[in-house]
Amino acid sequence: MNRLTTIILMLIVINVIMDDISESKVAAGIVCKVCKIICGMQGKKVNICKAPIKCKCKKG
């Protein structure tokens, strides 16, 4: 029972991830987090962030 539940959960997670990757929401989310860190280190805010890595910062 426990093994079956684990397999079902894994299939659901894989399905959700594949849906997100096809819409590239996950990639964009990761890129935006990296952008926030990079811009934050420069004392700026994120202006544009898109996947694949396209990041532009703006002042203040």
Swiss-Prot record:
Function according to Swiss-Prot or TrEMBL: Inhibits potassium channels.
Keyword annotations: Amidation, Disulfide bond, Ion channel impairing toxin, Neurotoxin, Potassium channel impairing toxin, Secreted, Signal, Toxin
Q: Where is the signal peptide?
A: 1-28
Which cysteines are disulphide-bonded? Answer: C32-C49, C35-C55, C39-C57
- Protein name, entry field: Putative potassium channel blocker TXKS1
Instruction: List, alphabetically, the GO terms of the cellular component aspect.
Output: extracellular region
- GO MF terms on file? ion channel inhibitor activity; potassium channel regulator activity; toxin activity
Q: In which tissues is it expressed?
A: Expressed by the venom gland.
Species this chain originates from: Olivierus martensii
